Amino acid sequence: MRTANGGPRARASPSASPADPGLPEGSERTEMRMRQMCGGSETQGPAPSQQGGRGSNACCFCWCCCCTCSCLTVRNQEDQRPQRASHEIRTDIPACEESPTPTLEEVCAWAQSFDNLMVTPAGRNAFREFLRTEFSEENMLFWMACEELKREANKSTIEEKARIIYEDYISILSPKEVSLDSRVREVINRNMVDPSQHIFDDAQLQIYTLMHRDSYPRFMNSTVYKDLLTSLAEKTVEA
């Protein structure tokens, strides 16, 4: 019988057999090799899973759009919470304020001063309707949002509403950005670190003055105001 090297294999002497009881022969050697091979593959088996584990952990720190790990799922859910809250707060300003039909005396008083117009919901509604025709309704919306903010007392709500107002009307990236001078913007930017309900007071005053000097005179000569005044005058005559 030849060895694996091709040479003749020495016969095992009776005295050597007790010393080599554990050496496998024939099919036993083949079986042991198979076990070693299987055992090697089993020991190497966990490596891909560990590598995969490292991949999933690394995935948590990437920003690829294909990532579906649970870490980013939680992060996405957290990112959506303020968006939902922002949407709920944004609906606080209705498209039109609830108000009774103004009287002829009220509408005539709007022509006497801008304050008389802005103090009543009906006056603000009519003015907003006019501002829409000039594509400048954001001025009134900003002013109204500031009025709401000043009525808030809860700190977290104040911070959230201040952030929304900033994003909607102060940010240069917003399509509804209002016209403010650089000094007022700088003050707002500094105070956004810890906003109060009066953070936009200077900006609100600037926009109020802008509407008073620029939009209000045109409103008084607009069809929106004149048609409302005429309809109320006719109803008064009929009565």
From Swiss-Prot:
Processing after translation: Fatty acylated. Heavily palmitoylated in the cysteine string motif.
Pfam families, alphabetized: RGS
Q: How does it sit in the membrane?
A: Lipid-anchor
Which keywords fit this entry according to its UniProt record? Cytoplasm, Glycoprotein, Lipoprotein, Membrane, Nucleus, Palmitate, Phosphoprotein, Signal transduction inhibitor, Ubl conjugation
* Domain of life from the UniProt record: Eukaryota
Please give the coiled-coil regions recorded for this protein.
none
- What happens after mutating residue 32 to R? In strain: BALB/c
Where in the cell is the protein located? Membrane; Nucleus; Cytoplasm
Listed Low complexity bias regions:
8-19
Annotated GO MF terms: GTPase activator activity
- Main site of residence? membrane
Q: List the disulfide bonds.
A: none
Question: What InterPro entries does the record point to?
Answer: RGS, RGS_sf, RGS_subdomain_2
Q: What does this protein do?
A: Inhibits signal transduction by increasing the GTPase activity of G protein alpha subunits thereby driving them into their inactive GDP-bound form. Binds selectively to G(z)-alpha and G(alpha)-i2 subunits, accelerates their GTPase activity and regulates their signaling activities. The G(z)-alpha activity is inhibited by the phosphorylation and palmitoylation of the G-protein. Negatively regulates mu-opioid receptor-mediated activation of the G-proteins.
Name-wise, this protein is: Regulator of G-protein signaling 20
Q: Which organism is it from?
A: Mus musculus
Q: List the lineage, top down.
A: Eukaryota, Metazoa, Chordata, Craniata, Vertebrata
Gene of this entry = Rgs20
